[in-house]
Amino acid sequence: MDEPALDLTGVTLSPQKEMVRVFYKLLWDHADKSLIPTIFHPDFSFRGSLGPTLVGYRQFGGYVDWVTGTFGQYTTDILAMIEEGNCVSGKMLFHGFHREELFGVLPSGRHVWWTGMPIFTFEGPKVRDLFVLGDIHGLIGRMRDA
């Protein structure tokens, strides 16, 4: 966890990068599911950093509840963002306090983290597909060591 988060204070982002910022810093950091229709098409596809593949608002909202329930004070640090055409990718640091069993590891109450590499594919101003590759093995190791 030594890499600093991007300081986006006062930075004007492209509309797509701004949507990614809103996704992580407003939707995820505050578990604000009311933002889901603002960010995504109704039948968007999502593959989360912890493994599940989901479609649509309802399934994704359940994933938000599950992750933020499993990790107290869940937060994402945006470490990098790269934009090419209708795609935004990046490097993220996901972290929180381990408070529910996950991958067979009992809750420790300790602060744990894992990195993720998202690829957001936009169709117009909204996200059509989001694929996030997560370092699950690193997370499991940190949960076990906690």
What are these regions (language model features)?
Residues 1-146:
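C-terminal and inter-domain tail/linker signature
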